[in-house]
């Protein structure tokens, strides 16, 4: 939708004039969050019942989030977030619970612990016929947003076909020859996690996990924000995908683990829900099981990754407790901003960046002379660790 179309629709709904909206947009684009026009509407910053100028300026756009990453994430640490096998290796070695890995596909023979490495289609086929446990979940080691993932229920040995969780079927050889090897980092075959029964009965068959944003403060890791990524329909992942997936977001009170509100979609198409549209179960007011255990494990794990001053942890709550899926850079500010109706640059976050000594990089325009002369980056970490 174009700016003018959006502006006219907002004027019709709220009475806020087009020029008034344009003034907001220009001010926010030049401000610390560097929001664009589309983000103004995506985050519903025109809504005067929730927003004033101060609250609008707490929101961060994708341009602002890039500067946050440049400032708060060590460049040399990023592989831990980008490559899932690297993360799994570290987390497993440190004793944290991760999904059970069945095998790795990697043409050059990349290894992981004591699981088999499959180097070609023939070895994949043999493993799928005789070696793997069903059901299983597959995903690229490099990638995100649910791209390249597959959820397999079982194998029809007589027909030599895999039965997928969405009802589709694939010939085993067809599946094996079509596996991606993105960035040469391989493909992971792992257990298909079963979420806690209290979550499953509400969210359906998909794996509905939680995203916890942690700040690495001088006094130690602090849980800052949390969101429940609620699955919908036949979706096998909980990715929100800017509202296009049909999945929902639940804002979680960090202290209690109670879901305080739930939204679906973005911007002018956003709706607020109290119950799941398919299961009919209550979402708002639901207390996430094992919440304190999930918070505890994320805070303990956070200290093992000092190159990430802001961390976004993906955690699945299983019947027996929390399981770590991955650790993200920042962790997608949009998820929290949409779910919470609140920008991440609130008072707590501003105190944090002041504590880290990087507030000038995030206060407004980021000029070239503010970059570290040695590394060419904004970041405290690159300046602090002169590799």
Residue ranges and their predicted role:
Residues 177-205, 214-217, 223-225, 229-318:
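A long amphipathic alpha-helix within ATP-dependent nucleotide-binding catalytic cores
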Residues 83, 139, 314, 326:
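Acidic active-site catalytic centers that drive phospho-/nucleotidyl reactions
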Residues 268-299, 303-308, 317-387:
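C-terminal active-site "lid" helix and adjoining low-complexity regulatory extension at the edge
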Residues 107-108, 142-144, 194-195, 219, ...:
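Short, solvent-exposed loop/turn segments at secondary-structure junctions
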Residues 84-210, 387:
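Active-site nucleotide/adenylate-binding loops and adjacent lid/helix of ATP-dependent enzymes
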Residues 136, 222, 323-325:
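Protein kinase-like catalytic core scaffold
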Residues 13, 152-164, 238-254, 361-380:
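A short, terminal or domain-edge coil/loop segment
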Residues 2-133, 142-144, 298:
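Conserved N-proximal alpha/beta basic substrate-recognition cap immediately N-terminal to
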């Amino acid at each position: 939708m174009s700016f003018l179309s959006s502006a006219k629709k907002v004027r019709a709904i709220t009475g806020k004039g087009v020029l008034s909206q344009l003034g907001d947009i220009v001010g926010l684009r030049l401000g610390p969050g560097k929001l664009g026009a589309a983000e103004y509407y995506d985050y519903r910053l025109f809504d005067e019942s929730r927003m004033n100028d101060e609250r609008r300026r707490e929101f961060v756009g994708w341009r602002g989030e890039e500067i946050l990453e440049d400032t708060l994430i060590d460049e040399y640490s990023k592989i831990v977030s980008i490559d899932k096998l690297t993360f799994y290796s570290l987390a497993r070695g440190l004793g944290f619970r991760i999904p059970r890995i069945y095998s790795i596909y990697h043409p050059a023979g990349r290894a992981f612990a004591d699981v088999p490495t499959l180097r070609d289609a023939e070895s994949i086929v043999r493993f799928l016929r005789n070696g793997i446990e069903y059901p299983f979940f597959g995903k690229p080691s490099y990638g995100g947003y649910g791209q390249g993932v597959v959820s397999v229920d079982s194998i029809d040995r007589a027909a030599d076909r895999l039965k997928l969780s969405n009802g589709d079927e694939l010939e085993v050889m067809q599946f094996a020859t079509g596996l991606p090897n993105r960035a040469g980092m391989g493909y992971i075959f792992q257990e298909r996690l079963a979420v806690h029964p209290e979550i499953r009965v509400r969210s359906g068959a998909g794996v509905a996990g939680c995203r916890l944003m942690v700040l690495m403060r001088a006094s130690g890791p602090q849980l800052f924000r949390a969101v429940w990524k609620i699955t919908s329909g036949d979706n096998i992942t909980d990715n929100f995908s800017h509202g296009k997936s049909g999945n929902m977001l639940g804002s979680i009170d960090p202290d209690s683990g109670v879901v305080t509100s739930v939204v679906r979609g973005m911007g002018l198409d956003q709706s607020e829900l109290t119950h799941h549209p398919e299961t009919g179960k209550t979402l708002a007011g639901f207390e996430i099981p094992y919440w304190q255990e999930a918070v505890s494990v994320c805070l303990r794990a956070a200290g093992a990754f000092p190159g990430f001053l802001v961390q976004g942890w993906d955690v699945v709550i299983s019947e027996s407790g929390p399981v770590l899926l991955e650790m993200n850079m920042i962790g997608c500010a949009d998820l929290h901003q949409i779910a919470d109706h609140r920008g991440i640059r609130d008072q707590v976050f501003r105190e944090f960046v002041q504590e880290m000594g990087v507030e000038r990089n995030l206060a407004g325009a980021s000029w070239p002379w503010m970059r570290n002369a040695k590394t060419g980056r904004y970041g405290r970490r690159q300046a602090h660790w002169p590799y």
